[in-house]
Amino acid sequence: MKSLLLSVPVESSGSSLRVEPLRAAHLHGLQTEGLGDDLPRFQRLLLRSLVARLDGLWPGEPITRQPRVLVALEQGILRALVQVRPYNRQWSCWLLSLEELSPGQWVGRRQLLKALLQQALLGTDVRSRSWVIRCDSSCDEQLDVLRELGFQPLKTQRIWRPGNADASQPAALPHTPTPLPTTCQWSPLNRRTAPLLWPLEQAASSSHLRQIIDRRYPDLLDQSGRHTGVLLWDSGEASVAIAGLVRQELADGSFGIELLRDVAWDERLSQALPALLDQLLTQRPAVVLVTDQADSPLSQLLTTGGWHPLREELLLGRSLWRQHGRSRAVPLTHPLDTMLGRLQPQHPPLPTPSLGRR
């Protein structure tokens, strides 16, 4: 039977810190806590969380992949929440999304964040083998708590905003977007194009990260949506993916567009990417772009194109794969007698044939 987030508060000694699943009663205090504008979002979260909890009661394979939501309260005040959802279709890796509702320092913050994340880890499916979470690189206290819980940094990404997103600047006049090169084609992300994009997604991750997230190419379909797709280069014989855009959830709960490319810089991108991003900005002027922090050529291209870095985020992971693999490991050394025993004949030796004259 699948694990379920039970409504059992976690009490800390000497204070009224509680961690429990999101309930309708929590929504009543949003207005008094200055979170009235978030009420519609919390209502959607509550509905999705209830669906996920009901699904956990149903035997057999899961029906839905809705997030399970836990909230942390201090003296009845909502301080933080965490969403927990499957990160792949095997349910072996889960994504945690932590959101602090009371920014700044308050009594018991570190203790409550740790208890909230611990309960989130305990409440995932029994098939869970790993967990990932995104965190702003400047949130030292969150990072310290995550390291205490066994999370390790796996990837650093840079978040970009376009130059026209600056409210202090006058709005840019409408213009005709730059066309793609004639040998390039933009195709939406779907079942046909996901296998073409898959090698680029794999190239963007280390082998350790690939083992932790345990994804297959159909998992890319969960990152599809408006403005996502694959940039294909027509070589005359076949179409080859040279870049892609996928939907990516950020540390603050918002969504950006992640740009994927191969490890080696492809000179065809120097012409194709500016045209692609220009078309993207025409359709979505306030888009937020996500890239690998270590991708210097891409960073240079974006800076030249007027993009500005906002911040850096870390993708951290915690895995049980290594422990399971170690328990199944075969010893590399064997006693000498055992090795020699395998060389001993199992039957009496056959007589050597005579080569003499008859």
Which stretches of residues belong to each language-model region?
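DNA polymerase sliding clamps and clamp-related checkpoint/processivity subunits
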Residues: 84-88
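Conserved GNAT acetyl-CoA-binding A-motif
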Residues: 124-136, 282-293
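Active-site/acyl-donor-binding loops of N-acyltransferases
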Residues: 2-11, 149-175, 287-358
